[in-house]
Amino acid sequence: MAAAATQGGRSGGLGGNSGAGGGSNCGTGSGRSGLLDKWKIDDKPVKIDKWDGSAVKNSLDDSAKKVLLEKYKYVENFGLIDGRLTICTISCFFAIVALIWDYMHPFPESKPVLALCVISYFVMMGILTIYTSYKEKSIFLVAHRKDPTGMDPDDIWQLSSSLKRFDDKYTLKLTFISGRTKQQREAEFTKSIAKFFDHSGTLVMDAYEPEISRLHDSLAVERKIK
């Protein structure tokens, strides 16, 4: 009984010391990890096949997008995506009309309508190619920063990226467009994907997030100076 009491007292003392140490660690670590905890992707590590270039690029793009939207609280604008969806919807409309018309009026009676729909479909595909090449480019995020006073138009932030096939160099570009002056500034980095993924293919946000924040902060500082 006495030995058990003594052992319990020691355990209690150790628990108290551990609690004090935990409080100290919390005080020093919360400043660094507090922001990261807010925008983990689904609170799970992002793990991909390192040899799948598309998966690598998509995971890096999604994580960069997550930082701007959740850390900096910007509002995503879906205008670019809506434009592409509109073009695709019109293209599908022509295809459906051709299908229904051919069913109701079998060939060759449906020939003029089929020809018109086929030509229209390929014209829309050409428009889509031009749209993605010159309008969308490689942009995967357009986000707005609301003016706190509500007096000036929104500032616009754009993220675009590239990763060539069979290459390990990933380029991320951040573009800032001032809502008030319409001036545009850019910052980018090119890094090996090996810097952001461990040996198992898990994205290391502690290595990736600072690179994105540096890009953002460099443009944000210029904005404040001007």
Swiss-Prot record:
InterPro entries: Spc2/SPCS2 (IPR009582). Pfam families: SPC25. Keywords: Acetylation, Endoplasmic reticulum, Membrane, Transmembrane, Transmembrane helix. GO terms for biological process: protein targeting to ER; signal peptide processing. Residues 9-26 have a biased composition (Gly residues). GO terms for cellular component: signal peptidase complex. Residues 1-26 are annotated as: Disordered. The modification N-acetylalanine is found at residue 2. The keyword GTP-binding does not apply. It comes from the Eukaryota. PANTHER family: MICROSOMAL SIGNAL PEPTIDASE 25 KDA SUBUNIT (PTHR13085), SIGNAL PEPTIDASE COMPLEX SUBUNIT 2 (PTHR13085:SF0). This is Signal peptidase complex subunit 2. The lineage of its organism: Eukaryota, Metazoa, Chordata, Craniata, Vertebrata. The gene is SPCS2.
